[in-house]
A protein has these predicted regions:
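Charged, compositionally biased interaction regions
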Residues: 1-311
Length: 311
């Protein structure tokens, strides 16, 4: 926070001490207090930046000592949280602007990264890196990209990502890759990903506190989708006849209409039935199936697919 304050203000962080507390000289308001280890109280439920309500959990309590404010024209900042685009949209854009070039130096081999706003910023990362480990081999496969991926998922707020798509810009490719061209970036990755090799799961790891898709509070899984090399498939541009009721979201990406979630037991049976139905079908041009309860919405706009990567 101190580093960010300095970058944001364009000068070193100015402070003083009073009553044993560090006081910012640039802040409009400062609240000082003490936290007693183990003295927790329930917090929540409250609305979060993904548009849902959190559950109640015990968190540390601060006993306020004093509240300081500037004498004149003090501004009390506040924000509104909810489904994107709201709070994280502005914060995300600002952080991208401030840290975009710095991350390339912080993470060796990283060229571009985009924390996608429509997914809630944290859950979905798109990245372009270098692939220099084995230039003497004919086979092109993710290698250095995996090293970069681990560094990304071990760096600050980037560690909150649930899905990380990463590839390398191949100089032989006719198109210029950009993480900001999300449909083009996903198409490039999905044409090249080897689904028997390029899905790298991290299980029983730390995740966002607000993510309830895990096995417990702050505990769950995430996945790296690393794609590099020559195209392995041509992506479909229409819904295959074997997938009636599905909607085409992007080339090679289908939204499959399912019932609204009611229980894990029912969902398990639905997916078993879907697997049985599709296992003998020719889906070679389909790289990604999205199971959802509103396929029409997911296919409606390019940003809708990004929402599917929230949790």
């Amino acid at each position: 926070e101190l580093t960010f304050a300095g970058v944001l203000g364009g000068k070193k962080f100015q402070y003083t001490y009073e009553d044993g507390f560090c006081i910012s000289l640039d802040a409009d308001f400062v609240i000082t207090g003490e936290v007693t280890p183990g003295a927790n109280k329930p917090e929540g439920p409250f609305g979060d930046h993904l548009g849902y309500y959190s559950l109640a959990h015990d968190f540390p309590v601060m006993h306020v000592h004093k509240v300081y404010a500037k004498k004149n024209n003090a501004i009390w900042p506040f924000t509104v949280v909810g489904r994107p685009p709201q709070e994280d949209t502005q914060f995300g854009a600002l952080i991208h602007e401030l840290t975009g070039t710095a991350l390339k130096h912080e993470i060796p081999g990283l060229k571009e990264i985009n924390a996608v706003d429509a997914a809630g910023v944290h859950p979905l990362l798109l990245a372009i890196g270098s692939e220099r480990y084995t230039p003497y081999l004919k086979e092109k496969r993710p290698s250095e990209l995996l090293t970069i991926s681990n560094r990304i998922l071990g760096t600050g707020q980037l560690s909150l990502a649930k899905f990380l798509f990463i590839t390398a810009d191949d100089s032989s490719a006719n198109e210029k890759l950009s993480v900001n061209d999300i449909p083009g970036f996903l198409r490039y990755c999905l044409e090249r990903i080897d689904l028997t090799r390029d899905l790298h799961f991290q299980t029983q790891t730390s995740i966002d506190t607000l993510d309830y898709s895990g096995s417990g509070l702050n505990s769950g899984s995430k996945v790296v989708l690393a794609a590099y090399g020559e195209p392995l498939r041509k992506l479909c541009t229409s819904v295959p006849v074997s997938c009636p009721g599905a909607r085409l979201v992007l080339p090679g990406v289908l939204a499959m209409q399912m019932d609204k979630f009611s229980s894990y037991e029912k969902a398990k049976k639905e997916f078993e039935a879907l697997n049985e139905k599709l296992k003998n079908e020719n889906l070679s041009e389909v790289a990604l199936l999205i199971a959802c309860d509103d396929a029409a919405f997911v296919a409606e706009t390019a940003s809708s697919i990004r929402c599917c990567f929230s949790f």
